[in-house]
């Protein structure tokens, strides 16, 4: 692995792995991940991907071993707090929050328990993988508690008699419900984020990072946007434009065969819901198309 190539650490397996790989491919990076390889070389860019455990990524960044990393904010903050407590380097730069990996770290209790607030957790034993985030939350509330640290299957701890409650990642809440638990407190909200090590970069690496960030912005914006095309009566054009959630003013073009109508094109940064389409139709709009956008650049 050459020091001249940009080194990016990503999760080898898990909830962020697939979407992270897809994002880099949408940014134009060509690579082939197969087998148990730990380092993957991009075929068309001077970039190496390191496939590692998610909890190793923050330390690789903070120790300056890799240049960039994609990591869940929950894992990043857990490691930062742990290293800070140990007096180890914990600096990094956040380049941008990404549009996937959303979850929350929550305290969950028995589904039949009455819960009046954080004070009800006083003196309780709480099972978690995220002991630092839990401690930070409970200390801020000045609530005494004890921790049962587990590295998996946290949700079964109360039934096994290991704890009174748990603090674990929640996406939909289905796992909690299946284990007879309910959310009581949200400790931390998280998404995937792109981070960078501290220190200087040479001109080539800095330019490559800027290029990746620009492409990521385009990919994320395209994913959140739609291209809308329709035909509109000229006498209802202003009313129709007021219904369209466009990023900029729409493009209005004459139709060759119908002087009473124009073609309206625009990029929408919001979803065009069925109700809006029905309102457009009621105003006389026709040939309404809502299309996905693969890439865009402002």
Swiss-Prot record:
Enzyme nomenclature, EC number: 2.4.2.17
Gene3D superfamilies xrefs: 3.30.70.120, Periplasmic binding protein-like II
GO cellular component: cytoplasm
Presence of keyword Ion transport: no
Entry-linked Pfam families: HisG, HisG_C
Catalytic reactions of this protein: 1-(5-phospho-beta-D-ribosyl)-ATP + diphosphate = 5-phospho-alpha-D-ribose 1-diphosphate + ATP
Activity regulation statement: Feedback inhibited by histidine.
Cofactor names: Mg(2+)
Stretches assigned to coiled coil: none
Subcellular location: Cytoplasm
Main subcellular location of this protein, as a coarse class: cytoplasm
GO process annotations (BP): L-histidine biosynthetic process
PROSITE patterns named among the record's database cross-references: ATP_P_PHORIBOSYLTR
Pathway participation: Amino-acid biosynthesis; L-histidine biosynthesis; L-histidine from 5-phospho-alpha-D-ribose 1-diphosphate: step 1/9
GO MF annotation list: ATP binding; ATP phosphoribosyltransferase activity; magnesium ion binding
Keywords: Amino-acid biosynthesis, ATP-binding, Cytoplasm, Glycosyltransferase, Histidine biosynthesis, Magnesium, Metal-binding, Nucleotide-binding, Transferase
InterPro entries assigned to the protein according to its UniProt record, in alphabetical order: ATP-PRT_HisG_long, ATP_PRibTrfase_cat, ATP_PRibTrfase_CS, ATP_PRibTrfase_HisG, HisG_C, N-reg_PII-like_a/b, N-reg_PII/ATP_PRibTrfase_C
Name of the molecule in the record: ATP phosphoribosyltransferase
């Amino acid at each position: 692995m050459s020091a001249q190539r940009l080194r990016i650490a990503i999760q080898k397996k898990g909830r962020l792995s697939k979407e992270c790989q897809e994002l880099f491919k949408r940014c134009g990076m060509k690579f082939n991940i197969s087998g148990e390889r730990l380092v993957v070389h991009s075929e068309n860019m001077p970039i190496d991907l390191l496939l590692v455990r998610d909890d190793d990524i923050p330390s690789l960044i903070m120790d300056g071993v890799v240049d960039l990393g994609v990591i869940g904010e929950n894992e990043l903050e857990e490691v930062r707090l742990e290293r800070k407590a140990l007096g180890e380097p914990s600096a990094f730069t956040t380049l941008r929050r990404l549009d996937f990996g959303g979850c929350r770290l929550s305290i969950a209790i028995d589904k039949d328990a009455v819960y009046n607030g954080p004070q009800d957790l006083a003196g309780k034993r709480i099972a978690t993988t995220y002991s630092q985030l839990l401690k930070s939350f409970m200390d801020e509330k000045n609530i005494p508690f004890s921790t049962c640290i587990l590295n998996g299957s946290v949700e079964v701890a109360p039934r096994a008699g290991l704890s009174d409650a748990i603090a674990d990642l929640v996406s939909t809440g289905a796992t909690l419900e299946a284990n007879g638990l309910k959310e009581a407190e949200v400790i931390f909200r998280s998404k995937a984020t792109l981070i960078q090590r501290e220190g200087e970069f040479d001109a080539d690496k800095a330019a490559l990072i800027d290029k990746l960030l620009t492409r990521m912005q385009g990919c994320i914006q395209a994913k959140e946007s739609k291209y809308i095309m329709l035909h509109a009566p000229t006498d209802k054009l202003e009313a129709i434009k007021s219904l369209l959630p466009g990023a900029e003013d729409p493009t209005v073009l004459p139709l060759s065969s119908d002087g009473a109508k124009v073609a309206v094109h625009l990029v929408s940064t919001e979803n065009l819901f069925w109700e809006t389409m029905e309102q457009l139709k009621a105003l006389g709009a026709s040939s309404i198309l809502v299309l996905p956008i693969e890439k865009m650049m402002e």
